[in-house]
Amino acid sequence: HAEIYVQESSDRAFEEEVMLSGFANADVKAEGQGISYDEAQETFTARYTNETIALAFAITEEAIEDNLYDRIASRYTKALARSMSNAKEVKAVNPLINGLPSGSFKTGDAVTLFSTQHPTIAGVFSNTLATAADLNETSMEQALIDIAAMTDERGLKIAAKGMKMIIPSNTQFTAERLFKSQGRVGTADNDINAVKSMGMIPQGYRVNNFLTDTDAWYIITDVPNGMKMFNRAPLTTAMEGDFDTGNV
């Protein structure tokens, strides 16, 4: 999840962020005329609700009496840590898996995370390909073209750039060829690999083994205030005895 989200701290049950529209393009002021005024607007509110993740195991009183505690506890503790880590990773990829146009994960603007119809004051904008496509040279180049054309809430160009690609393990070999080949992939043409030559997506690709869509791929841009993850309390462990059973 660290490759997807910017992590911030939290000290409450939920966090809210209000999206501001910014201003329209500045106008030329004629000599002697007054300055034109514009108003920034609140467009939508995004809420991040904290959740408590917990899991426990018990060792019987009899196992402790048989001097099995150290042997069992060490193995169980490692397994518990793996379970907690897995839960975090599964939750982290949920927006990516269910944020597709046919999915159920919606953002603060009431549409799915990946949509061609994100509403703005200036109209709509898209953060996904107009026609879904597997990862290849054509689709990756089109995605970078679309990213460069992104606008803000008021329709102003923001000169966004793709920084990093997130992919499932099934696509890693395709990604390696697309990112590392000097020439174009899968063609006899003596052309350079434009993405590599131009230094686009400078952070390369990262494989996320928790993605369940085997042909999905995502590009993280340099646009600020993107994917965020709040951490209210770090992972802690505790040991308590059960009065009724004597288990620990």
Predicted regions and their residues:
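Short, charged/polar micro-motifs that form catalytic or ligand-binding hotspots
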Residues: 13-18, 22, 43, 47, ...
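Alpha-helical scaffold segments that mediate packing/assembly in large oligomeric complexes
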Residues: 67-75, 82-146
